[in-house]
Amino acid sequence: MQLNSTEISELIKQRIAQFNVVSEAHNEGTIVSVSDGVIRIHGLADCMQGEMISLPGNRYAIALNLERDSVGAVVMGPYADLAEGMKVKCTGRILEVPVGRGLLGRVVNTLGAPIDGKGPLDHDGFSAVEAIAPGVIERQSVDQPVQTGYKAVDSMIPIGRGQRELIIGDRQTGKTALAIDAIINQRDSGIKCIYVAIGQKASTISNVVRKLEEHGALANTIVVVATASESAALQYLAPYAGCAMGEYFRDRGEDALIIYDDLSKQAVAYRQISLLLRRPPGREAFPGDVFYLHSRLLERAARVNAEYVEAFTKGEVKGKTGSLTALPIIETQAGDVSAFVPTNVISITDGQIFLETNLFNAGIRPAVNPGISVSRVGGAAQTKIMKKLSGGIRTALAQYRELAAFSQFASDLDDATRKQLDHGQKVTELLKQKQYAPMSVAQQSLVLFAAERGYLADVELSKIGSFEAALLAYVDRDHAPLMQEINQTGGYNDEIEGKLKGILDSFKATQSW
């Protein structure tokens, strides 16, 4: 075969004419060191704080330290195969996670990728994990309740929509149990829930997901997981990712509840990252900005006004306020609430529920210490009936604690003191509650009414539990319409008081327990 030189030259000319040169400018750098999930990069001149850096193997790192001649970044995911000399690129984007209703009922990781084996996510777009909290003008005061279903909490330490209420206590005092029951109690309230598990065992999280499914609450909940085996970067970012998912509902005029379990582990992960980035350590080796770590997260939990929602949705949603209620959990060491992270979070939040080991071991569950537990804004959100009936409970318990301390030294007690001690013991017994058994407002109100009006005076201490169970079974059977009315309105007047009195009188006269 003979080659024609003219044809070949024509063919080459055609190819040259068709060739399209596309130049792509990107900021490229080189990894100069890798240590425990933190990489140092040389050459990323235009990198921004918090920017995602593209690594080999379809992974990303987040730039946290911007120095004169290098960038310190944390790797999100496995880092064992990264080595010096590898090329990395800036992306010009900050970290975003998928948000939307399609995430409800799903278990996702920090980056929003599903890990429950139920297929791809159906999301409504992406949202930045770091967002500025709503300003003062965009907020509205807290005046609607979030019912946890616990008598001890809803009566003495009420939580409102848009509030931040800290759950604090030693390990094994029922902190997660309280939070999970609060989620289970939102099945029919319309409040969407987000549960963020930070640094926990995978088996523990699996158990939580199973319990939520058993009680019909998973369909209303997003579970965000950063297990103990995952990198410190993912544990540090998990709460912000969960918060972004909760803000989706808040900004559209809906109510959401988010649980951070727990922020102590997030602070430890952040400390690890900061020390590896050679940031100067402070108290307890935490970096100087550990307060800001939690304040910028918890300030995003708020109740926003109707104008904010209308502006955000461009007029699609009108006349509705939105809220994101946060229940951060902090684990203390030997009951020391004066440690660095606990004091920080106590000062940021609007109150705390303090769970005590001694009470837990004594069989008082939830192990709430009513003396130092407080809700700074929840009182305004309480329903009328709960506010009316719960005042005497706190007083009775305070008097009981004071008298119980003195009665240990006094041999003979007068009748009035003996009655107060007896009443206090019975109220303490009445506030005990089993796990996964949240109570409605009407049920709580009836039980508190019985304690407040002296109906427990002739009931033996050992029979308080069976008295309560029999009373609730009796009203569910014979007085369901009244219970329904109280649940719907939460109101309290002479008529309702008379009906409650009539129920208790007839119950004590005709029933046994």
From Swiss-Prot:
Reaction it catalyzes: ATP + H2O + 4 H(+)(in) = ADP + phosphate + 5 H(+)(out)
Reported impact of residue 175 to E: Reduced activity and reduced ATP-binding
UniProt topology in membrane: Peripheral membrane protein
Record site: Required for activity: 373
Subcellular location: Cell inner membrane
Cross-referenced PANTHER family: ATP SYNTHASE SUBUNIT ALPHA, MITOCHONDRIAL
Oligomer status and interactors: F-type ATPases have 2 components, CF(1) - the catalytic core - and CF(0) - the membrane proton channel. CF(1) has five subunits: alpha(3), beta(3), gamma(1), delta(1), epsilon(1). CF(0) has three main subunits: a(1), b(2) and c(9-12). The alpha and beta chains form an alternating ring which encloses part of the gamma chain. CF(1) is attached to CF(0) by a central stalk formed by the gamma and epsilon chains, while a peripheral stalk is formed by the delta and b chains.
Record protein name field: ATP synthase subunit alpha
